[in-house]
Amino acid sequence: PPPPPGPPPNP
């Protein structure tokens, strides 16, 4: 399976 998504970008 594909890797999990990374963390959200900083604002």
Swiss-Prot record:
Positions carrying Hydroxyproline: P3, P9
Predominant subcellular localization, coarse grouping: secreted
GO cellular component, one term: extracellular region
GO molecular function: toxin activity
Tissue expression notes: Expressed by the venom gland.
Keywords: Hydroxylation, Secreted, Toxin
Subcellular location per the Swiss-Prot or TrEMBL entry: Secreted
Organism domain of life: Eukaryota
Record function comment: Toxin. Induces vasodilation in mice and rabbits.
Protein name (record): 1095.6 Da venom vasodilator peptide
